[in-house]
Amino acid sequence: MTDTSDGPAPDRHTAFRRLHHGDRPLLLPNAWDHASAAALVRRGFPAIGTTSLGVAAAAGLPDATGATRDGTIALARGIARLPALVTVDIEGGFGERPEEVAAVAAELDRAGVVGVNIEDGRPDGTLAPLARQCAVIEAVKDRVPGLFVNARTDTHWLAAIGGGTPPSLATTAERIEAYVRAGADGIFVPALVDEHNIGALAGDLDETPLNILFTPGRHTYERLAELGVRRISCGSLLFRAALDHAVELAWSIAHPGVPARADQAADLPGYAEARSLADDFTGAGPT
């Protein structure tokens, strides 16, 4: 059943879609709290996303486990009041059944959010069954047709964070094609860094925007644009950079004679390191 309650005005939904089809790719910075969101909007970014890792780690909770459902929704309500278009990372959807995920999406839509990011990676390091994930996308689009659903496949991401070998591009393409048929408005393939593969997927998708996670040292905005990428996400990069800068600044005050690191970007804490910060609050960290 289509949700007819108050939400973003149709022109906001349309405006967000248009950002994916402009002359240049949409650069989407990802906030983790009210202050980071407001700072990005003040800088002039027309659209912002949230980072599930940043939201989770800032709350002392593990990422990608559904633990931040309430916090994510509360944050979304707050930052949706800013003069920018907001899309929210809802991990796997914060629900087991498709209708539960659709209810979360409808709640966010009522709050003024214009898009959601839904991933198929599961906490146990496996991919959700393809049919189940398609049912989730279909349920969300049926409930809130105007909401931009960015369907994320973790075929490459799970391999990257687990130290494994990514599957063939055909495996990723199979999921992508199914998600588009289910109604996805955009496709996100984090940890896909090979330029040939990026260009191939972008070409195959045609009018469906391909979203790539920006990887410092591997990507440039201009090159991704040349490859046909329509949306470039920062993911947890800004959160990790903020953590690193804060720690290094504090250290430099106490140790004024110690030179700064030569390559700040290369030495940023990685996803696993940032995610492990939550262990210090759950009893799984150092003793």
PLM features: residue spans?
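Extended, intrinsically disordered, low-complexity segments
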Residues: T2-A9, L237-T287
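Alpha/beta enzyme core
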Residues: D3, G7-V88, G93-C234, A241-V247
